[in-house]
C-alpha cells in the first residue's frame, strides 16, 4: 500500500465519524470506543483495488492483533473480511502506530480460544453468533 494512495472510509455514519476522529487526532482519540480498544484496518478492495478503511474492536495474542468479522451478526461476511481473504496484506493503525500486517483466518482450537478472549472484551459477539447461520470468522493479523 503506497502512502499516497487514496483510502475510502466506511460509509456507515458512526464508523466514518470514528475513523475521522482517530485519523485527525493521530490515534490520540478513537483508540478507545465504549471502553474497548479499537484499531483502523485498511484492506484492498477485491473488486476495485481501492483501499478501504474501517474501525474494529481488537484483542492481542502475543505480538498479533485479533479482530472478529461479525458485522453485528449479519447473514453475510463483512466486505473488509472478504477483501483480506483475497489479499491478506493489510495496514493497521493502533493508536498512533501505523504498520503493515498479514491477516489469516483462525480455525479449530485457536479460533475457539481467541473467540472466548474476544467475547470477554465485547460480550455481544456471542449474541451476534446466535443470530446468524454463518460461522463468524476470527482473524489474526501479524505485523510484518
Task: Report each predicted region and the residues it spans.
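Extreme N-terminal tail/first-helix region
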Residues: 1-34
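Short, structured beta-strand-loop surface elements
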Residues: 3-5, 71-125, 131-135, 143-144
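Short secondary-structure boundary/capping segments
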Residues: 30-31, 57, 82
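A generic structural micro-feature
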Residues: 33, 48-50, 84, 133
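Short beta-strand segments
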Residues: 36-72
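Short hydrophobic/aromatic beta-strand or adjacent loop that forms the aromatic wall/cage
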Residues: 38, 136-138
